[in-house]
């Protein structure tokens, strides 16, 4: 059983690692980040990374291991959201470390961190996948995932 635990600890979880990287960047600004803001920054980091050709389909296949879902306030990675839901609308204060493999995305992340979260929510609501599935949202959530193609389409249509 202990061996299983250690294997779990070493398992790569790229979306969670990207979330930790974003949190660390936000903490470095001294402002921190809320759970809602984290979700929007994660989403738009991927969208803008595709647009700037820093992220390609292979990167997505290797790193997009936890899907976003269509929720009231835009795309949400459910397991990451639930991990930080204890903070409510407050700043996440658990210290996190940046991951070198995501450093190419730092300019995008830093720019997104400067934007108002309400603006990011509104922008995410303009994307076709969210618009076409908004009616599936019940009590703020849906089980409609964003597939790789949905992310690529969002990046291409919002240039």
Tell me what each language-model feature is.
Residues 1-159:
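Domain-edge interaction signal
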């Amino acid at each position: 059983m202990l061996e299983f635990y250690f294997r779990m600890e070493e398992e790569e979880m790229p979306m969670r690692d990207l979330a930790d990287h974003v949190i660390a960047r936000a903490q470095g600004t001294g402002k921190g980040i809320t759970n809602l803001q984290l979700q929007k920054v994660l989403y738009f980091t991927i969208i803008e990374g595709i647009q700037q050709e820093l992220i390609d389909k292979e990167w997505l296949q290797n790193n997009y291991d936890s899907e976003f879902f269509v929720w009231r306030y835009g795309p949400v990675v459910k397991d990451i959201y639930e991990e930080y839901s204890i903070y409510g609308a407050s700043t996440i204060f658990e210290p996190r470390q940046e991951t070198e493999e995501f450093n190419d995305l730092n300019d995008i992340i830093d720019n997104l961190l400067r934007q108002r979260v309400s603006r990011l929510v509104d922008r995410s609501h303009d994307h076709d996948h969210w618009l076409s599935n908004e009616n599936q949202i019940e009590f703020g959530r849906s089980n409609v995932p964003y597939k790789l193609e949905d992310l690529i389409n969002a990046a291409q249509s919002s240039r």
